[in-house]
Amino acid sequence: SEHAVAAARVVLASGGPALILPPQGYAPPVGKRVLVAWNGKREAARALRDAWPLIAEADEVHVLAGSPQSEAGPDGMLQRYLERHGCKANLIVDPGPDETAAEVIERNIAEYDADLLVMGLFGHSRLLVLVLGGVSRHVLSRPPIPVFVSH
């Protein structure tokens, strides 16, 4: 959608993170209940690091991993990292076998009443804008809550 492509262009052009708001606006407080979409890739790690000032002040932080292999890790490596930095996070491993990754994210936003989604924007500049795919396109085209995104 146009909203998703415009959001991707903002992130890519800025060279830094961006806060993407739902097209209809958003009035409630942002950042009290944070959901981090985690897949263990560089972009997810960058988004987590860039959003740290918000994450550190949140009342609740939920880290959503699609599988134990996504480096949130069966050994809890990411969770221990967050705790060492003063953030007690709830690790959610939710493979959603009959859902797309975007549907799993949306379901967990509702389940945990999240008011901010933190996620990495995956891909390469021009190609990303042309074929903004999968999870990024779905989430950014109609975000139900504000989305903090980094590339």
Predicted stretch roles:
Residues K41, G134-S136:
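Short linear Ser/Thr-Pro motifs
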Residues V10-V11, L82, I109, L140:
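A generic structural signal for well-ordered alpha-helical segments
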Residues P17-G25, P74-D75, R80, D115-S125, ...:
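A short, terminal or domain-edge coil/loop segment
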Residues G40-I92, G96, E103:
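Redox- and metal-dependent alpha/beta enzyme cores, enriched for Fe-S-associated oxidoreductases
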Residues R84-L117, L121-L130, R137, I145:
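Structural beta-alpha unit
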Residues A4, L132-G133:
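Glycine-centered tight-turn and secondary-structure capping sites
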Residues S1-E60, L64-A65, R142-H151:
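Intrinsically disordered or low-complexity boundary/linker segments at protein termini
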